[in-house]
């Protein structure tokens, strides 16, 4: 089970704590932040991108495929119809057959974070005593 704690002491800069890892999230200057770290949607995209490349690396390892460097570029946008979309574009430094590429696209659609985002998730919110 994943667990993260976020601490906010001043403006929009947030301390994100996950086990022994620490990072800062913030809003860009244009939104009143200090741009001291990725914005929340950038962290969401980073989660999806990391899960994608990890899953592809695991799958390729089991198949004996050499992918080389994996690059996953992601872009979030909300259309005028309020429809939210994430565009995920993957590239590999090693040559792959069209069949391998098609299979990797299929596998990317089955990563844990992809499934969570695609299904939606219930969020229970409360105030601690």
Predicted features by range, described:
Residues 1-46, 54-129:
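Extended beta-strand/beta-hairpin segments
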């Amino acid at each position: 089970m994943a667990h993260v704690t976020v601490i906010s002491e001043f403006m929009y800069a947030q301390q994100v704590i996950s086990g022994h890892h620490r990072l800062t999230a913030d809003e860009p200057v244009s939104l009143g932040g200090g741009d001291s770290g990725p914005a929340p949607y950038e962290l969401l995209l980073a989660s999806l991108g990391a899960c994608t490349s990890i899953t592809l690396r695991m799958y390729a390892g089991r198949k004996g495929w050499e992918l080389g460097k994996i690059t996953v570029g992601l872009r979030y946008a909300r259309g005028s119809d309020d429809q939210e979309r994430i565009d995920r574009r993957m590239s590999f430094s090693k040559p792959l057959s069209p069949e391998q590429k098609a299979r990797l696209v299929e596998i990317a659609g089955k990563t844990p974070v992809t499934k969570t985002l695609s299904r939606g998730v219930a969020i229970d919110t409360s105030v601690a005593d």
